């Protein structure tokens, strides 16, 4: 049986063994591994280890910030614009400006559907993926869509910035395509003792609503 020398090539996933025949005292091996050309002079009786090197691929960088907007309208003169932004997997910042409100507190919620074919009534109930009862934004037990109250000044304008970690713009519980709704009355945050306290916060009618849609960064 003829004697052989062995050389190997190693990558992150495979090792290859190739015999060097004894018929040549100094065989010249020309080959290519993973797109890298090799030219190796091997002497009989020696063992060679060759390592293939891959060319780095360009990285694809995705924008870490997501932004969205909702334009609120209704059957009255109440209207507004709400912008939402989220960095990476952090909380979502919500900037609210609504006009035409009666001065005072108004419940402000994210509802489960982005359907406004029947006005704000067709937006469904509060967004509640965890099937909990209604509460305040800071409560452990709350709907994800429970954003508390906004306050309108004497001119009927409510301007506020909210930060919440249960209304992401991506992922299985993304709020994109759902609706923001401003209500007629104050939200009792689930603590008012009314029969509707643990479902709607007894916040009354729906004055204006808008579907959350993604916007350019």
From Swiss-Prot:
* GO CC term, one of those recorded: chloroplast
Q: What is its main location?
A: plastid
Q: Which GO terms describe its molecular function?
A: copper ion binding; superoxide dismutase activity
From which residue to which does the transit peptide run? 1-63
Q: Which GO biological process entries does UniProt record here?
A: removal of superoxide radicals
Q: Per its Swiss-Prot or TrEMBL entry, what cofactor is needed?
A: Cu cation; Zn(2+)
Which InterPro entries did the record assign? Answer: SOD-like_Cu/Zn_dom_sf, SOD_Cu/Zn_/chaperone, SOD_Cu/Zn_BS, SOD_Cu_Zn_dom
What is the enzyme's class at the highest EC level? oxidoreductase
Cited function: Destroys radicals which are normally produced within the cells and which are toxic to biological systems.
Q: What is this protein called?
A: Superoxide dismutase [Cu-Zn], chloroplastic
Species source reads Solanum lycopersicum
């Amino acid at each position: 049986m003829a004697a052989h020398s062995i050389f190997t090539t190693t990558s992150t996933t495979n090792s290859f063994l190739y015999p060097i025949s004894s018929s040549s005292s100094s065989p010249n091996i020309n080959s290519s591994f993973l797109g890298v050309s090799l030219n190796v002079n091997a002497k009989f009786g020696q063992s060679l280890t060759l390592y293939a090197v891959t060319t780095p691929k360009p990285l694809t960088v995705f924008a870490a910030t997501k932004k969205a907007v909702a334009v609120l309208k209704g059957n009255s003169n109440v209207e507004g614009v709400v912008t939402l932004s989220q960095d990476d997997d952090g909380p979502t910042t919500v900037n609210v400006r609504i006009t035409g409100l009666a001065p005072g507190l108004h419940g402000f919620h994210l509802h489960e559907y982005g359907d406004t074919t029947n006005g704000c009534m067709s937006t469904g109930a509060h967004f509640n993926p965890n099937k909990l009862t209604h509460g305040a934004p800071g409560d452990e037990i709350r709907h994800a869509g429970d954003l508390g109250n906004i306050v309108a000044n004497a001119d009927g304008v409510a301007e506020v910035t909210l930060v919440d970690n249960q209304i992401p713009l991506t992922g299985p519980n993304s709020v994109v395509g759902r609706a923001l709704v401003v209500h007629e009355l104050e939200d009792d945050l689930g603590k008012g003792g009314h029969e509707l306290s643990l479902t709607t916060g007894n916040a009354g009618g729906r004055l204006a609503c808008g579907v959350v849609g993604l916007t350019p960064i």
